[in-house]
Amino acid sequence: MRLILAAVGRLKAGPERELASRYRDRAAQLGRGLGFPSCDNVEIPESRARRAPDRCAEEAAALATYLPSGGVLVAYDERGRADLGSEALAERVAGWRDAARPALVVTIGGPDGLDASIRTRAELILSFGAATLPHGLVRVLALEQLYRSLTILAGHPYHRGEAG
């Protein structure tokens, strides 16, 4: 199962880009031994359409091109679930992998958010809470959660779980 983070907008050089790259590299390295041959970070250009709904629709069409037939779409959106813990997410990732799904595509919208068509197609919609976060940090956090899911599946000590 390929892992793909597809986000609208470009991360500028700086600490967020470096940290996102670090988590992507870690996930790619660890994932190879767990049935995840690659982890890609794809940047979709922001639409230049005049109206926000048109921008969202254009960006959704571009994001959808990265979802292969049978792939899993997970969206980060302000209306998403903030109550799914890392271990539960890891279980879902493992289930999708074990069902021989070809790819897990995690999407992050642009400044106007995600189009309803992406939210409708998504098998899981997540949120990092009610607070508004900078786009670059959301990307870092999404990649960190992918990496954390893989460490949980590998039994790696990075994730220590809940205190018993």
Swiss-Prot record:
The keyword Transferase applies. GO terms for cellular component: cytoplasm. The keyword rRNA processing applies. InterPro entries: Alpha/beta_knot_MTases, RlmH-like, tRNA_m1G_MTases_N. Its EC number is 2.1.1.177. Pfam families: SPOUT_MTase (PF02590). Its main location: cytoplasm. It catalyses: pseudouridine(1915) in 23S rRNA + S-adenosyl-L-methionine = N(3)-methylpseudouridine(1915) in 23S rRNA + S-adenosyl-L-homocysteine + H(+). Keywords: Cytoplasm, Methyltransferase, rRNA processing, S-adenosyl-L-methionine, Transferase. S-adenosyl-L-methionine binds at residue 109. One of its GO terms (molecular function) is rRNA (pseudouridine-N3-)-methyltransferase activity. It is found in: Cytoplasm. Homodimer. Belongs to the RNA methyltransferase RlmH family. Specifically methylates the pseudouridine at position 1915 (m3Psi1915) in 23S rRNA. This is Ribosomal RNA large subunit methyltransferase H. It comes from Methylobacterium radiotolerans (strain ATCC 27329 / DSM 1819 / JCM 2831 / NBRC 15690 / NCIMB 10815 / 0-1). The lineage of its organism: Bacteria, Pseudomonadati, Pseudomonadota, Alphaproteobacteria, Hyphomicrobiales.
